[in-house]
Amino acid sequence: MDIRPIKGNTWVLEGMEWIPFYKLDERRCILLDTGLLGEREELEQALLDHGLTPAGILCSHAHVDHGGNNRYFQEKYQIPVALTAKEAGMCAGLLNLKCYFLMLPPGMVEREAAHLVHTPDVIVPDRDGPLSFCGAEFQILQTPGHSAGHIAIQTPDRVCYVGDALLSREQLWAKLPYCLSHQAGIESREKLRDVDADFFVMAHRGMCRREELSALIDDNQALAQRRAGEVLAL
């Protein structure tokens, strides 16, 4: 798993998705998501190869490709995990997870997703604004839609990690956009237009500069509306 600098102390790990992290110093970092369960060894080794250990996890949302290793790092390194209350509730137990994996029987949920069950140490407030976490000051933007408690996270370097609120340009034609709430997703994407950041990082492998953001939002909105129209026409 390669790592790539974005700006200042903000970097990304390049796995199946991009996992941003913020370096507190030369040895400690805050992970913004933890990727898939199957990426655990590669993710951990990439950090170790660069002399880094996680000091905390600030999670955009609790889907399998974003919070898949939260509990592992929380328990192994004795570090805090921060989630919104809505996402924390989903991870509170197997029955709660069944609401996410609605079509799967309970036994399959346990086999496929038991690793997602954990209790966060910090509940991210249900509002936009600053969040002090593990000695760093982040800006939180509530961006529900893709999931109930999805957030975008801006690092002190003016890098905004939008998680799954936006698809990168390379994914616009390769991925079916999913939203728990289509309308909330539309509103959250529009909200991103006003974010005062220099770079925007998308979980599904992409980044854009401030001046490129508006066009990318337009294309995301058009894709969502087009797919919704196709479904409606069935």
State what each model feature region is.
Residues 9, 22, 33, 61, ...:
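Divalent metal-coordination and catalytic microenvironments
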